[in-house]
């Protein structure tokens, strides 16, 4: 019981201190884990959070991601968690590479990826 409470507090602290880009990656982690566990509800919730957080003011990126998220949601509804997980892993890798490039440049402030707004609600906590 105590360990679970401590872990939850630690996770909340990570979320509070995370950059917008790190929040995107953390949401991917949760979506991938949910798909691997074949947790229908949490898979739908996390992928929907990624989709709903897209900033459509940047349609060049956002529309493509929107369509991929919709496709992943369709896969999950059909029980095809493997295809959804594969796609989410590829997208996560791309965002992680972006984060690594930014950190390598030693940028002190990281702005959110242009395709995302900055709110993910309580999906990560």
What residues fall within each predicted segment?
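Surface/interface-facing alpha-helical segments and adjacent flexible terminal/loop regions used
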Residues: 1-52, 56-125
